[in-house]
From Swiss-Prot:
Reactions performed catalytically: adenosine + phosphate = alpha-D-ribose 1-phosphate + adenine; S-methyl-5'-thioadenosine + phosphate = 5-(methylsulfanyl)-alpha-D-ribose 1-phosphate + adenine; inosine + phosphate = alpha-D-ribose 1-phosphate + hypoxanthine; adenosine + H2O + H(+) = inosine + NH4(+)
Essential cofactor(s): Cu(2+); Zn(2+)
NCBIfam families for this protein: peptidoglycan editing factor PgeF
Designated name of the protein: Purine nucleoside phosphorylase SCO2081
Entry GO MF terms: adenosine deaminase activity; copper ion binding; oxidoreductase activity; S-methyl-5-thioadenosine phosphorylase activity
Organism: Streptomyces coelicolor (strain ATCC BAA-471 / A3(2) / M145)
Length: 242
């Protein structure tokens, strides 16, 4: 259920795998995405299971309506009955409020400054990397008092550069913005390494305490992958501060 987790000075990070939930094929088992065609009741149950496994109150988790952009929402509570905004990063200065990001190949980016009590979760796919969602999230954190030098960053399971095949023109366009994303597949064709691009951006922003998951979602049967399966579930990354 919780494939990876880490705690640093009261900052908590967790990434799910696909097991331990109640969703049926092709979303088996722990699908946390509410917009992929799965039974809404199963998604709600899965979100409760994952939150409780992490020791988080399911009612204190903030989700996003992710659209592959660079918009950021600053939050101090869950959305409740309000519409969930179309953003790809959420930032909070509310300790104990968990932020969640959904992925199935894109890079889940979790950030926290334990001193200021500011945290962020961002969804960085190819478009978001180019649009600058990660710098936007770090800037929003800084506006709330975070210091990039204190930020702890964790990126979760994502499709790797050996597997993320793209047309040559697309690789060139992305590499023109972020050279670190330039990659080649294991079979010698153009590819992108979005995780490498994210970490390069974080380094330039002054975020040095970083760790990257070794898991490639396309290669791992324990994780959802849109590129591999198309119709499938979504993983989640969670971050919160004591």
């Amino acid at each position: 259920m919780i494939g990876q987790r880490d705690t640093v000075n009261g900052a908590h990070f967790g990434f799910t795998d696909r097991w331990g939930g109640v969703s049926a094929v092709p979303y088996e088992e722990l699908n946390l995405g509410g917009a992929v065609g799965d039974d809404p009741g199963a998604v709600t149950a899965n979100r409760e299971l994952a939150a409780k496994s992490l020791g988080v109150d399911p009612a204190r988790v903030v989700w996003m309506n992710q659209v592959h952009g660079a918009d950021v929402a600053v939050v101090d509570a869950p959305w409740g009955d309000r519409p969930v905004p179309r953003v790809d990063a959420v930032v909070t200065a509310e300790r104990g409020l968990a932020l969640a990001v959904l992925t199935a190949d894109c890079v889940p980016v979790l950030l926290a400054d334990p001193v200021s009590g500011v945290a962020a979760a961002a969804h960085a796919g190819r478009p978001g990397l180019v649009a600058g969602v990660v710098p936007a999230a770090v800037r929003a954190m800084a506006e709330l008092g975070a210091d990039p030098a204190r930020i702890v960053a964790r990126t979760g399971p994502a499709v790797c550069g050996r597997c993320y095949e793209v047309p040559e023109e697309m690789r060139a366009e992305v590499a023109a913005v972020e050279p670190a994303a330039y990659a080649e597949t294991g079979w010698g064709t153009p590819a992108l390494d979005v995780s490498a691009g994210v970490h390069a951006q974080l380094e330039r922003l002054g975020v040095h305490d970083r760790a990257q998951s070794p898991v490639c979602t396309r290669e791992s049967a324990d994780h959802f992958s849109y590129r591999r399966d198309r119709t499938t579930g979504r993983l989640a990354g969670y971050v919160w501060l004591d």
